[in-house]
């Protein structure tokens, strides 16, 4: 009886280890799907494979990433622009949780389609922080973002997770 009880406890412990391991792996994948891939390489621009939907009135496009630098000096984003893009503005922000680290408005007229849009940042003390790149507008802009769908990362449009990453890079030291 005592031996049988030990065997049962051993089996229960083994099953518990397997279940906990599975839950841990599943939660990591689920976290990645909701928040983007924590290992997303933001030190280089990704090659675009598609274009996002247009950034219009009230649209909020977000990409989560872990900052590899203590100081972010520059942010580079590749936009796509329609022929009828107007003179409206787009807001580019970096958030640390809900706290804004950086925010700048850019005139759509100053953006060249499918070229690097360089934005000076100068924010410090960010190495290892989970940041969110947020791109939004209060008006219809005629702008979209270049997207690399061949990554395991996810970006969000108005809270909906979509496979891929915005074609952007962060430079600093």
Question: PLM ranges: what are they?
Answer:
Residues 2-99, 109-130, 136-173:
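Beta-sheet-rich sandwich/jelly-roll-like modules and their strand-loop junctions
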Residues 104-106:
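Short hydrophobic alpha-helix segments
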